[in-house]
Amino acid sequence: MAVKILTDSTSCMNNDLINKFHINLVSLSVSFDDESFKEKDISNEVFYEKMNEKGIPKSSQPSIEDLCSVMEEVVSVGDELLCIFISSDMSGTYSTAHIARDMVIEKYKDAKIEILDSRSNCMQLGFAAISAARAAMDGKSLEEVKLAAEENMKKSRFLFIPDNLVYLKKGGRIGGAGALIGNLLKIIPILTVEDGKTSVFAKIRTKKRAVETMVQRVLEDTDKFGMGGIAVHHINCYDEAKRLAETIKNKFKVDPIICDIGPVIGLHVGPGAIGIAYYTEKNMR
């Protein structure tokens, strides 16, 4: 009997990480008027071409069928499962997973399935899933594996910078007037995820300065709490992400992971966005 991990596609983990840590993944979807895609099945390049042509799509949580399928695959062979998902304030995935679990437990009475709200997304979620997977690979119990994820959540932060405010405005994530004023004044916000919701971390005049401010915050946190792990996120700006990763490598003496941000998160932020997700050795909160 082993403990397995299930997370969702908004963790933005690349295939190397998924395979290395034996993590199960269920995908959220994006839907235009005439077609739908699981976000793992469409590249950012194709997605934004379609978005420019067809307008803002809707995002949707994984189906109950998809969730039940993965859960059954795990528990049917006697393994236990920890599910850790995107913040419940951002998606109904966490809520739907409880319905799926109840359905699976009706069929497999002895099944053990725990569900955790990460209160985050992207690699802030991914790092919690990886921490759980490491504990599982060490032979820890389901309760200990869940605790490992919860402990990582106390140590992590995600900062990201949109290239402009157009997509945030289109997606309705900030007020239209705020987006217009921001663009007129050429203000670039640094955004973060705090207690499950997106909030403004800082407002900076240029993207270059915003990136410097973001790196400086990582430096302050890791000087105080130690460096655990770090990832650079980007949307269709790999060269910029690679330069940021090189800066981080030189400054922190660690090799950051580089991960795309997929369509479900990306439709609210837009191409050109760049960010850093990281966790520390000691608790930040």
Curated annotation (Swiss-Prot):
Hexadecanoate binds at S59, S91. GO terms for molecular function: lipid binding. PROSITE patterns: DEGV. Transmembrane segments: none annotated. This is DegV domain-containing protein CA_C3284. Pfam families: DegV. The keyword rRNA processing does not apply. Residues 3-280 form the DegV domain. The keyword Membrane does not apply. Keywords: Lipid-binding. May bind long-chain fatty acids, such as palmitate, and may play a role in lipid transport or fatty acid metabolism. It comes from the Bacteria.
